[in-house]
A protein has these predicted regions:
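Ubiquitin-like/PB1-type beta-grasp interaction modules and other compact soluble beta-rich domains
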Residues: 1-69
Length: 70
């Protein structure tokens, strides 16, 4: 069994494989990448870096979704 990292996403504790990156987290949560901003350990990560940014054990991730309206 692959090692799992315990990660906090928007205040909720979750497990992800130790090889998971930010793009994997967004995909696992079934979010549209074009409509979210991701912060890792209080630092905003640009979308083009998500796939190369691994999610370490104990990481804190905040994801903000953009919604249209008027």
């Amino acid at each position: 069994m692959a090692k799992q990292n315990r990660v906090t996403v928007n205040g909720e504790s979750r497990n992800f494989p130790e090889t998971a990156n930010l793009a994997d987290v967004v995909r696992e949560l079934k979010l549209e990448p074009e409509r979210v901003a991701v912060e890792l350990n209080r630092t905003i990560v640009k979308r083009d870096l998500w796939a190369s940014t691994l999610v370490a054990d104990g990481a804190e991730i905040e994801i903000v979704q953009f919604v249209g309206g008027g």
